[in-house]
């Protein structure tokens, strides 16, 4: 995870 994982974790 880098792009998708980063924004997903931040959105949670």
Swiss-Prot record:
**Domain of life of the organism encoding this protein:** Eukaryota
Specify the protein name. Answer: Unknown protein 1
Q: Which organism is it from?
A: Daucus carota
């Amino acid at each position: 995870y880098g792009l998708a994982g980063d924004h997903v974790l931040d959105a949670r």
